[in-house]
């Protein structure tokens, strides 16, 4: 076992994903998820040494109890894992304009994460709790905690991409602009694509589609992000599981003025009750939409709107490629597994030279990637993402 092990923590508002990864060879020694925080059914499940395990955390348990369980129950069974830890990597959703790359966590970095709380009110406070608990649980690694920001990869966007057409002082004084998210995933799959296409990263022109319960598309030119679909928050852009993505902002005024909804109710509607959930009025699960596309009107409606929006973004981002698009890339839970989403979306993009091979497309799922396009047509790559590995690599690189 290597002494290059990194504990990777991804703290959500009601969950904590964790893993222990060898930062050099990518081997995963432990992975798990603690969820349903602050509820009676709070629980934790994990994989270690080829076995799957789960346990109750106790009613009302949250981040502190989950980390205590990881340290005192899981790692106590395998003390050599704890002994080999050299760093802790934290996924941070929003780093604002301050962070263009990963950073060792100092008081200044903590303040920067706090300053971005208004733009990520569910995520950043949870990240801060995770950092605080990690410092308590692993005091010997106090100066080896690293923040890896979802927003960092998008900081290469030019002004014409990140500015909204609002009074300029709102940007200068209040930092209201496009930031973008899923940056770690877009970064990882673009680097993997460079290997597949046998091109130097700095010459790579691709459009990456991270499609999960949240989803975003990124235009990458010469290896750098030049535009992305999510905005100030992760609400803008694509149709998502429960988020609406792009809408006319005046819809909000109509909901308030004509339907009498208050701001909190409108926020809940747009973030928790829209997207696939809203269009089907049944579920946010894309598998339902795929399975019932031919037989249920709600599933067809949701899938058609979803793929229309996705194709529109890919098409518009092709205009930013300066005449050369090397490939489109699909990743994330939906991007890696939903063959129908890929096929229906790319079918709309024949003008760009995409032509899907039906059998290759069906075969690319459950961790199996590859080029799903017919020979001689523009590549469409399915590449499983590995955000945890990027976080581990960055944490090790900065602290070694």
From Swiss-Prot:
Organism in which the protein naturally occurs: Pectobacterium carotovorum subsp. carotovorum (strain PC1)
Gene this chain is encoded by: ackA
Binding positions (substrate): 91
Annotated coiled-coil segments of the chain: none
Molecular functions per Gene Ontology: acetate kinase activity; ATP binding; magnesium ion binding
Record-listed ATP binding positions: 17, 210-214, 285-287, 333-337
Stored NCBIfam families: ackA
Keywords, comma-separated and alphabetical: ATP-binding, Cytoplasm, Kinase, Magnesium, Metal-binding, Nucleotide-binding, Transferase
PANTHER family: ACETATE KINASE
Localization, UniProt: Cytoplasm
Protein name (Swiss-Prot/TrEMBL): Acetate kinase
Pathway(s) of this molecule: Metabolic intermediate biosynthesis; acetyl-CoA biosynthesis; acetyl-CoA from acetate: step 1/2
Binding site for Mg(2+): 10, 387
Recorded catalytic activity of this chain's protein: acetate + ATP = acetyl phosphate + ADP
EC number: 2.7.2.1
């Amino acid at each position: 076992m290597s002494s290059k092990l990194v504990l990777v923590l991804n703290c959500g508002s009601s969950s904590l994903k964790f893993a222990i990864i060898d930062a050099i060879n990518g081997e995963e020694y432990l992975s798990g998820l603690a969820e349903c925080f602050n509820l009676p059914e709070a629980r934790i499940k994990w994989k270690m040494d080829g076995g799957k395990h789960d346990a109750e955390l106790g009613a009302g348990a949250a981040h502190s109890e989950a980390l205590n369980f990881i340290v005192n129950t899981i790692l106590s069974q395998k003390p050599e894992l704890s002994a080999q830890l050299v760093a802790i990597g934290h996924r941070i959703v929003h780093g604002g304009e301050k962070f263009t790359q990963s950073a060792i966590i100092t008081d200044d970095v903590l303040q920067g994460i706090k300053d971005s709380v208004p733009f990520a009110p569910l995520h950043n406070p949870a990240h801060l709790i995770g950092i605080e608990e990690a410092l308590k649980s692993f005091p010997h690694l106090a100066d080896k905690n690293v923040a890896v920001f979802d927003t960092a990869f998008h900081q290469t966007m030019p002004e014409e991409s990140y500015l909204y057409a609002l009074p300029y002082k709102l940007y200068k004084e209040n930092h209201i602009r496009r930031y973008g998210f899923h940056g770690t995933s877009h970064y990882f799959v673009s680097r993997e694509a460079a290997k597949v296409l046998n091109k130097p990263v700095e010459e790579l022109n691709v459009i990456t589609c991270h499609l999960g319960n949240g989803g975003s598309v990124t235009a990458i030119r010469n290896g750098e992000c030049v535009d992305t679909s999510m905005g100030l928050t992760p609400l803008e852009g694509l149709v998502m599981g429960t988020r609406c993505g792009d809408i006319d902002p005046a819809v909000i005024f109509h909901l308030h003025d004509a339907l009498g909804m208050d701001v909190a109710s409108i926020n809940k509607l747009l973030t928790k009750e829209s997207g696939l959930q809203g269009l089907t009025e049944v579920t946010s699960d894309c598998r339902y939409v795929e399975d019932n596309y031919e037989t249920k009107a709600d599933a067809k409606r949701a899938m058609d709107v979803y793929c229309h929006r996705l194709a529109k973004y890919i098409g518009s981002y092709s205009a930013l490629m300066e005449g050369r698009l090397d490939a489109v890339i699909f990743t994330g839970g939906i991007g890696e597994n939903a063959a129908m989403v890929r096929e229906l979306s790319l079918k709309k993009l024949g003008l760009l030279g995409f032509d899907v091979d039906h059998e290759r497309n069906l075969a690319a799922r459950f961790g199996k990637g590859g080029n799903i396009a017919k020979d001689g047509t523009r590549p469409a790559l399915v590449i499983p993402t590995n955000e945890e590995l990027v976080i581990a690599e960055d944490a090790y690189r900065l602290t070694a």
